[in-house]
């Protein structure tokens, strides 16, 4: 390669002879390769491993999606989620700061909107995502969901039980959903987490009866990427 575009500062032959990709599904293999010098770059390093690598002199570089943040998408055609008050109760019932503190690192900033800060059309909507469990309880009471004998809220004889997928490619999805399960359970909202493998997750996600809270992230950088949310 010896024909760089005129706008590029470096002209002439590339500084490196090539790039070799090694597919390593196990994180321990990836971290071991970079610590031992067998690799120069490793992707998909989990938050708990960052400190270990930094102590070994490895630089951690993180970046947002340029698109849709890691989030829970409401399938609001489901009868339990059609009421906006229930959706708002779920939002205010999740302590995002606690989740970040327990599971993640400084590489994962608190989201301010569905759209990432580096995404096209970003607008700070932090006020809509505040943690306020008392407001959650008020909204659920107002929507007619009253605590049942086991603590799970009930309306018209139906328990407020919602099912979530596990987004296996996304960082610590199962752990995140487990914390969400605990936080919302304290408010009387039962969350069932789909335990299936990737094939099962993909198949079940197509049915609103099997998945009502969809853990999702989109990496495309096009301006109308939020439209992706309307297809799940």
Show where each model-derived region lies:
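Aromatic-rich, solvent-exposed beta-strand/loop patch
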Residues: 1-26, 49-68, 146-149, 154-156, ...
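Append "and occasionally in soluble cytosolic enzymes with long acidic Gly/Pro-rich linkers
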Residues: 7-9, 82-182
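A local structural motif
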Residues: 11-22, 158-164, 182-196
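Extracellular/periplasmic solute-recognition and catalytic clefts
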Residues: 20-78, 85, 89, 97, ...
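Hydrophobic alpha-helical packing residues
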Residues: 34, 53, 140, 180-185
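Exposed, low-complexity coil/turn segments of extracytoplasmic
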Residues: 38-41, 89-92, 180, 184, ...
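Short, well-structured beta-strand/strand-turn elements
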Residues: 44, 146-149, 185-200
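Acidic-aromatic pocket-rim loops
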Residues: 113-114, 201-232
């Amino acid at each position: 390669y010896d024909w760089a575009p005129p706008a590029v500062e470096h002209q002439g032959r590339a500084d490196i002879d090539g790039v070799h990709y090694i597919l390593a599904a196990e994180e321990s293999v990836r971290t071991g390769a970079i610590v031992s010098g067998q690799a120069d770059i490793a992707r998909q390093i989990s938050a708990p491993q960052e400190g270990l690598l930094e102590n070994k002199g490895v630089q951690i570089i993180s970046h947002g999606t340029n698109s849709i943040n890691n989030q829970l998408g409401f399938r609001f055609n489901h009868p339990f989620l059609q009421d906006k008050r229930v959706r708002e109760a779920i939002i205010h019932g999740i302590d995002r700061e606690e989740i970040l503190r327990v599971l993640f690192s400084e590489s994962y900033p608190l989201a301010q909107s569905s759209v990432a800060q580096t995404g096209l059309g970003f607008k700070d909507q932090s006020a809509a995502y505040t943690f306020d469990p008392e407001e959650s309880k008020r909204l659920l009471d107002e929507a007619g969901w009253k605590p049942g004998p086991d603590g799970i809220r009930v309306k018209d004889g139906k328990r407020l039980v919602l099912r979530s997928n596990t987004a296996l490619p996304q960082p610590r999805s199962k752990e995140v959903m487990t914390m969400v399960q605990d936080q919302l359970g304290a408010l009387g909202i039962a969350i069932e987490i789909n335990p299936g493998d990737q094939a099962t997750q993909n198949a079940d996600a197509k049915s609103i009866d099997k998945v009502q809270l969809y853990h999702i992230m989109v990496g495309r950088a096009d301006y109308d990427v939020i439209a992706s949310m309307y297809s799940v």
